[in-house]
Structures are given as C-alpha cells and as structure tokens.
Amino acid sequence: GNISTTALGLSEGIMWDFNKRAVSMDILDFYQIEKDKVPDIVPSIGVQGKISKENCLNFGLVDNVTISYRAGDQPNNAFSLNVLNDGEIAATAGTSAVIYCVTKKDISDPQNRVNTFLHCNDDINNKRNGVLLCINGSGIAYSWLKKTLKINSYFEMDNLSEEVNSSEGLSFFPFGNGSERLFNHNKNLNAMINGLDFNIHNNSHIIRSVLEGIAFSLCYGIEYLRNMGLNIDSVKVGDSNLFKSKIFKEVFVNVSKTKLYVYNTDGSLGAARGAALGSGDYNNEEEALSSLKLIEKLNPQESKSMDASYKNWKKLLNKLI
C-alpha cells in the first residue's frame, strides 16, 4: 500500500514548522531523519486513499472503501462539536480532561504546559491551530472512587453528590494519573484529599469533593490559557463522561465564569461526519454538522461559597507545587 500522513499528524509529532507551513527541517536534522522518509502529506478531511480489496475482504467490508478523514482524539472531539473557527473552544472530561481552543494565533509555551498543533480543518487560506490543555487525573479519579466505595453506577454517585450543598471543607486534588504537564517540570503530585473530618463527612461529601476538585483543575487550566491571551467565555461539550454530572457542570461554569453548551454528540459521530464530509457526501462543514442539537445551556451564576472553596483549593495547591 501507499504510506501517507497529514500536516495535523506531523504537528502532533512536533515535526511541523508553523511559520513556514512545512515539515520542520530543524527537527528532522536534529534527529537525523532523512527528508524522503516523510510520507506524502494528504488532507485531514478529504480522500486519502482506499482500503485494499484483500483487507476489505478480511474485515467484511464492501470493495473500495475510501479513507477520507483522520484526526487525533481532541481535534476530532472539537470537530464533532462544530468547534472549527478562531475563538471556539471544546472540552471533554473522560479518563483525562481537556480544554481545546481553536485559534489563528501561533501560540506556544516554552515550558510545554500546553500543546499546540494544527486543527483538522486548517488550510493555507484560513489558519486554525488547536491549543490543548490536559489534566490527566479526571474521570479516572471518579472511576477509582466508584470502585473504592463499591457504588453500582455513576448515576448513583451523581445522585449522592446532590444530597449535600457543599463538600464541607474537603479539598480534592485529582493528580494521581501520572505527571501533570500543567505544572512546572511535568510534576507528579499524586492525588490527595484534604480536610477530612470523621464526624462530618460521608460518601456524599467525598463524591462531591472529587467532582469539585476535577472541575477546579480545569478552571485552573483555563486561568492559564487566559493568561496566554486566549479569550475563553464559552465552551462546547458532548453529553458524556463527567459532563453528565449536574454538580460537575455547575461548579465548572460558576467558577470558570464561562457559558457551557452541551450537545447530543460524541467523538464517534464526529468521525463519521468527518469521513462523510471528506468523501463528498456533504458539501461543506456547515452541512455535515447541521443535525447537531443543543440539549442544554448553562450560564455562570454568582456563588461566593464556591469561589471561596476554589480560592482555598488554589492556596493548598500552591503549597504542593
């Protein structure tokens, strides 16, 4: 078969020169990679090739299946949410949590706390970069808690979290899934819970504190992105993972001071629509995403108690880092 790659893929592999809009010869030279080893570059959204007849037969596919879309998980999540233009922002909170900002700016961080690469619909006439901020400890913390407390479902956990009005002074830090690039020197803080009182706290408080701690981590990351010059006043998410939790959504919105738009989509639907667009079944991006439905919108509400909890959380975090 024929080997090919995309500019997006090269940028994710730090082999793209954003200024020259070409393969980075500096990187190739440094690692002594010959230029002819770089495959042909094809568009992320568009016909890239076809699956061989033999492989179609092996996988039970019809003949001549076209490969017409490829993107990393976060550019694809953004595409699924119609986050395609400068200033638009997508998020997810699965095993890890991500804020993904589309911008026409060439933004970079010397300390690598965020990653910048081309967005899936970048082209020479309309620059679109994706700036990615990741929190490794997110849904994995909620999953760990579910197993540890032996609770049957996330739905039950969400209900328990709503039985209390606050976490009563508990502060949770979800950094137990390896090093966090958001902190200087890619620091591994480990997860921890602070302020536990055996006479006050029960499962509901602990569950709520975990949801708050994960949301606070994203809000902390948003502060950093804003300091980089990115305007973040609204975020789009799919109706999945931690964004199914009422408490998580409310804490995220009220502390970050951003509007939240929840849509009936996920990454698999986005990939299917991207492939259909790339193969010509849709005429443009707008048509491909026309069936996207907004199912919930949340506006930030003033919450002095939650702001105080976040302030205390950051104070404790600063001691850890």
Predicted regions and their residues:
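Active-site core segments that coordinate phosphate-bearing ligands/cofactors
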Residues: G1-S4, G9-Q32, K53-K236, N241-I321
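Short beta-strand to alpha-helix junction loop
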Residues: D17-K20, S44-Q48
